[in-house]
């Protein structure tokens, strides 16, 4: 049997312990799973509201992608992506680094150019960015790390009723304090770092895919957020080098089976060649 602690010393020890625990958790910090999820959702909603309120924006991202080649070998690809958005119906993105691609969406059609391969593809597209992003995923299985933040409501794209996880803690990057959030949903786990004060715009994300046969992990760093960029009108007009070959955008078989013939046969929008 241990020697009992004198009453006065015991009170002092308990007080010190309580104080240290309080400081470790921080005032008002979530302590339960439900509180952590609620805090995480609150921060995502705040970030979403900021982007929703911006009719135009531009951002540059650096991506480190862990991919699986058709041979089954692992490959790490590093990309830089510059994105320009004008809601509700204009989008442009250029990718450099391990690949060199451009995408234009002008409210009528979508044009994809693969510069390394010297080919381009076109397809008619719905009338809004939101519907076009949905169509790209459903028809072609295409999605990018920036896609969720381009939607009218990023929170609705990122969070579902099945989402678990939430607030992890606060971290410092340089002189900036960030809220670190981690979530899990069907087939995916993802983390995001958002400034605690100032504009709540994403600074970094890490996404891991459990069942994706092509991409296992994407680490994305955001920089140069601009919520009031000056965008030339021709930014959203596709231009393709004259010697590039046009190819078809192959849709998922299940979509083609259920698509009306007239929709599947719709001609692509016109494109200007340099």
Residue ranges and their predicted role:
Residues 62, 102, 111-113, 158-253:
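Gly/Pro-enriched, hydrophobic low-complexity segments
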């Amino acid at each position: 049997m241990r020697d009992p602690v004198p009453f006065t010393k015991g009170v002092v020890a308990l007080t010190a312990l309580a104080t240290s625990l309080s400081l470790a958790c921080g005032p008002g910090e979530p302590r339960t799973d439900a509180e952590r999820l609620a805090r995480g959702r609150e921060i995502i909603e705040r970030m979403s509201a900021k982007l929703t309120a911006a009719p135009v924006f531009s951002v540059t991202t650096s991506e480190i992608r862990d991919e699986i080649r058709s041979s089954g070998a692992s490959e790490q690809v590093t990309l830089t992506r510059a994105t320009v958005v004008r809601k509700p119906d204009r989008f442009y993105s250029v990718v450099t680094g391990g690949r060199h691609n451009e995408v234009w969406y002008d409210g009528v059609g979508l044009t994809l150019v693969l510069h390394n391969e010297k080919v381009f593809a076109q397809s008619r597209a719905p009338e809004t960015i939101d519907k076009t992003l949905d169509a790209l995923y459903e028809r072609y299985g295409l999605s990018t790390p920036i896609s969720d933040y381009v939607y009218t409501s990023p929170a609705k794209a990122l969070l579902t009723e099945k989402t678990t996880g939430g607030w992890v803690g606060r971290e410092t990057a340089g002189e900036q304090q960030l809220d670190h959030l981690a979530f899990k949903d069907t087939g995916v786990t993802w983390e995001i770092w958002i400034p605690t004060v100032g504009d709540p715009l994403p600074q970094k994300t890490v996404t891991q895919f459990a069942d994706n046969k092509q991409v296992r992990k994407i680490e994305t760093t955001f920089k140069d957020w601009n919520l009031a960029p000056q965008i030339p009108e021709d930014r959203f007009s596709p231009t393709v080098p004259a010697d590039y070959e046009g190819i078809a955008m192959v849709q998922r078989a299940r979509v083609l089976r259920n698509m009306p013939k007239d929709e599947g046969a719709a001609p692509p929008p016109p494109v200007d060649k340099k």
